[in-house]
Amino acid sequence: MTHQTHAYHMVNPSPWPLTGALSALLMTSGLIMWFHFNSMTLLMLGLTTNMLTMYQWWRDIIRESTFQGHHTSAVQKGLRYGMILFIISEVLFFTGFFWAFYHSSLAPTPELGGCWPPTGIHPLNPLEVPLLNTSVLLASGVSITWAHHSLMEGNRNHMLQALFITIALGVYFTLLQASEYYEAPFTISDGVYGSTFFVATGFHGLHVIIGSTFLIVCFFRQLKFHFTSTHHFGFEAAAWYWHFVDVVWLFLYVSIYWWGS
């Protein structure tokens, strides 16, 4: 589309939804191959395809919004509804994991020893690394709000500082989570406790990585003066997503780490 004479969202034909779906298939298949056959070839191919898709799709959206001016107020309204529905779908996604956890923990079967945590499982101390992780994510929630308010007030330097702090806290959280996984006294194959713990916290960790990537893109866009105090939906969507990640972690901490231990 070279010229647009209306306010509505008419997108160009794009291959990226198809390559994104293909990369998701390759990654999930690759994860199974890695778990069962210790082969990471398919997983690496999926990750590479996914990163290329992300780069090119983001590039196209930035070009359409910032340089071609296609993101009118009507288009932004549609994108807001889309992001809200996406976050609602993510809430339902995590609801499934919490359902699995509570289904197993509220009425433990004789195979689990009739208790929770199951016999033989030594849970992680919720007052050590998990509590630090909670503090880190809550602090990142404060800094992303600071960044948002700075952007709305036109304070570019404060916005960049706050956004950088948020990204650093997100990376720190990921490193802490990785070290916790490495030192955990149980694995994903240790029955229903191990599987619910690693799948729920692992998918949350994946969302933190996705959110951090989203914020890094926003950071470089802000360096190039892409956002104004009235036109910054890309950053707003990233902030909404980050707050969602924060809230999910609080539920995970209270349910799996604290109550579940």
Swiss-Prot record:
Membrane topology summary: Multi-pass membrane protein
UniProt xrefs under SUPFAM superfamilies: Cytochrome c oxidase subunit III-like
Catalytic activity: 4 Fe(II)-[cytochrome c] + O2 + 8 H(+)(in) = 4 Fe(III)-[cytochrome c] + 2 H2O + 4 H(+)(out)
Stretches of the chain found on the membrane's Mitochondrial intermembrane side: 35-40, 106-128, 184-190, 257-261
Molecular function GO labels: cytochrome-c oxidase activity
EC code: 7.1.1.9
GO CC entries: mitochondrial inner membrane; respiratory chain complex IV
One Pfam short name: COX3
CDD domains: Cyt_c_Oxidase_III
Membrane spanning residue stretches: 16-34, 41-66, 73-105, 129-152, 156-183, 191-223, 233-256
Oligomeric form and interacting partners: Component of the cytochrome c oxidase (complex IV, CIV), a multisubunit enzyme composed of 14 subunits. The complex is composed of a catalytic core of 3 subunits MT-CO1, MT-CO2 and MT-CO3, encoded in the mitochondrial DNA, and 11 supernumerary subunits COX4I, COX5A, COX5B, COX6A, COX6B, COX6C, COX7A, COX7B, COX7C, COX8 and NDUFA4, which are encoded in the nuclear genome.
Family: Belongs to the cytochrome c oxidase subunit 3 family.
Role this protein plays: Component of the cytochrome c oxidase, the last enzyme in the mitochondrial electron transport chain which drives oxidative phosphorylation. The respiratory chain contains 3 multisubunit complexes succinate dehydrogenase (complex II, CII), ubiquinol-cytochrome c oxidoreductase (cytochrome b-c1 complex, complex III, CIII) and cytochrome c oxidase (complex IV, CIV), that cooperate to transfer electrons derived from NADH and succinate to molecular oxygen, creating an electrochemical gradient over the inner membrane that drives transmembrane transport and the ATP synthase.
Protein name from the UniProt record: Cytochrome c oxidase subunit 3
Species in which this protein is naturally found: Damaliscus lunatus (Tsessebe)
